[in-house]
Structures are given as C-alpha cells and as structure tokens.
Amino acid sequence: MNLNTYMAESIRNIMAKAYLNVLGNPHEARFVARMQRTVTKAEWRRKIYLEKEGVEVPPFLIASIATTCNLQCKGCYARKNGIADDTPSKETLSPEQWSTIFHEAADMGISFCLLAGGEPLTRRDLLESAAEVEDIIFPVFTNGTMIGAVYTEFFRKHLNMVPVISLEGELAATDERRGQGVFQRALLSMEMLRKEKLFFGTSITVTTENYREVTSEAFLSHLAELGCRLVFYVEYVPFDETTEHLAFRDEHVAEMEQIVELRREQFKDMIFISFPGDEKALDGCLAAGRGFFHIGPDGAAEPCPFSPFSDTNAARDGLRAAIASPLFHKIRTARALGWEHTGGCTLYEHRDEVEALLQNKH
C-alpha cells in the first residue's frame, strides 16, 4: 500500500471513529457526517493535483498563528525557535493573509490544519478567519487557560474548530512545567466543553520522565471521564544538549509503540495519534510536505515546527510553491536516500544536514 492510500484510509478511520463518538449529540453527529464527505472530496482533490500537476499535496498542515502566550512553560520549543517571543512588533500575517492560505489549502485538498503558537486563543481574529473555511478541520492546540463562556460558545458555533488542551500528565507534572494552577484551570475548561457536549482532545508532550504516567490506564480513564475523546502524544524534541536526556531513545520508542497499541484496544471510544511514533508505520518522516509541513507566524514555510528552516513564504509565494519548495524537495530526497527513521524526530537528528541543505552546501 502506498503512502497516499495509507494516509487516506487512516483519515477515514479517524472520521469514522469520531462519528461513533458523537452519535449521542445530533448537532455534532451531523457535522461529522458532513466532514466525512468533505474528507472524501479533499482526497479526490489531492489525487487530481497529483495526476494533473504532479504536485503531491499533504493532507495535514500545521500553522503557528500566534506569537504571544500567557504562560512560560519550561522547555517551550516555540519560544526557543522564536515563534513565540511576546514581541508586539514581530512580523505576523494578517487575518486576510491567513484566510487566503486556509482557502488555498482547502482548494488543494488539505483536510486538517493544526493551529498552534504561542497561544492561538490570543488571536481571536485569526481563529475567526479559520472558522470560515468549513472544508478544513482545525485542531486548536491551546493551554486551556483562556477557555471560558465566550470561547465555549465559539467552539459550539464552529464545530470545525476542535480544542486540544495541552497537559504534561496529572497535577504535579503539568504544574511543574506549565505553572501553578494550570492543571486545575485546564480541567475546568474540559468540564465546560463536556457540559456543552463538544468534541475535544488533549495534547501531551511525552518524555523519558512522564511517558508511563500519561499512557497509564488510570490517567486515560481520568481523561475519558472528563469527556476527552482525542489524545495527541508528541515526543519531546530537545532544544539543546541539556535536555537531550528527556528525548526518547530506541527502547522508549519501542515501548511507547506497544503501549499505545494496547490503549487503542482498551479505549475504543478514544482516538490516539502518536507523533512522530506513528510515522514509523508510514516508512519515515512525514515532514517537508510528505504528509505535512509548517507555516510560521510570518508565513515562512518550514519542514516542521521542530525544524525552523525556510526558503519559501506561503503568503508571498502561495501554498503550491511552498509545497514544491527546493528545501522540501531536498529533504524528501535525502530521507529517501538513507535518513533512517528510528522512531524519534528525524529532522532533529539530522538538523545539521537540514541547515546545510538550506545553505546549498550539499
């Protein structure tokens, strides 16, 4: 089975499971049923682009729309990479520019656009621009502290905007990294979303220190009781040598893979997505347009949020040019020629080579 077929089937399976999860809520069930048709249409659009123009459109996009955040989480990659620096004068795209990108993405067949930051909920104007593009599902990765009555109503009105609340584990682990009181505030947000019967998820950065806790039956049962139906596991990527002990090694990757498969069987009403762990089944790294790519707040098209290198701007050059960027092509070629995927972040492991490709040294 080739990559496009595998990913298309995986997306259909996700949507089918999402539909089963919302059968008790007619409002959301109608929305998911419509999105199932939209995903099928997007798959057809991607196929047409490939056949007629030779452009392999990825089904996923990651967009960092915010440069500010109300938290100071330890080891935040967005701050380290300069995405979030709380600088008001930092160059960012306008709502109109983001709207153009999102509409272009929908027209090309991109099904999911993950909104990140910074804290996306600090940019209500950009969220409104995204919400208008109803042919794309937008998981909104938020720390959960800004969800109140106003945002709960926003998510109820725009069901294609799916809140994904970040945690590090239970109270001690979350507050240790994110700040005192953040865990309880996140749970309060989950409770508000649950009462409105809204579909929402959580995102967990997994490290060598917390992966057993966040994959435990007790922790996942707690999330299920809170109404959470979607779990993103994102393996920690070091921002310098001092944090490399937190990154997975081969033995952690193998154990994590086994545990997640077990939990998928145990918690059939929850959707589990493991990144980059699930890439192993897809023959390696999906970044640089193979399965997804990243757009920064200024429009820079980058292989991945963890690989902040760019030679193309999506706002200036268009999304088609971003997908076909020389850097992305070089990375995909280098990966095919032997950048082995062991389960961790391939681009981090080859960061010097990626930078060299950008500088045309190879």
What are these regions (language model features)?
Residues C69, C73-C76, C285, G299, ...:
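Short cysteine clusters
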Residues I83-P88, L171-R177, F239-E244:
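A short acidic, helix-capping loop that chelates divalent metal ions and anchors anionic groups
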Residues L286-R290:
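Short, small/polar residue-rich loop motifs at catalytic or cofactor-binding pockets
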